[in-house]
Amino acid sequence: MEEALLDPTNPYAATKAAAEFIVKGYQHSYNLPVIITRSNNVYGPHQYPEKVIPKFINLVERGRPMTIHGSGQNLRSFLYVKDIAEAFDLILHKAKPFDLINIKANCEVTVHQVAETIWRLMKKEGNVEDHIQYVRDREFNDFRYAIDGTKLEKMGWEAKTSFEDGMKATGLLGIIGLCVVEWYQSHPHHWDNIESALDAHPTLPNVQVNPMVL
């Protein structure tokens, strides 16, 4: 629930909580009509490849293994960009100043399922497991990010796009004409240099591990 006490479990989560408190501080000090939103992971065309979906697509396109932190069983919820754009539009028109609103995805998948889906949609041959490299898990990597979306649902919004449909969807707002996978395949040089973004641990050495002993 939106009103639940914030209890960050790691430094990254603490920065998210701190950002909210800074905004609330300005809100109370200057009576700014602030609305705070919290959402699940957003994905779609044009997303920078440091995020898991474009990262995996770009790695496969380059003939490199998809690097999975830990066992790959961590759960993540994904929101297609069109859905969250519609949520923002509704919030701007219907929410009240000082509201705090969760934007909840309608699906939850493991990171391993993300890799499987991308491999299948890219129509690659062979066993996907042969093209996955398990690396040491991130420090303080939460197993799951779950939020309650009841408040926004009562306002008339819910995510319409399943993860599978979002990966097949025809680009940003249906205008580009390419599904998520096809967009990255068609724009390999959209960014000058993404090699550092494709590293499993940009600041740590890649250490291959056996997922069965994690």
What kind of feature is each model-predicted range?
Residues 41-42, 74:
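A short, flexible beta-alpha/helix-coil linker loop
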Residues 1-36, 43, 47-49:
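Catalytic helix-loop patch of NAD(P)-dependent Rossmann-fold dehydrogenases
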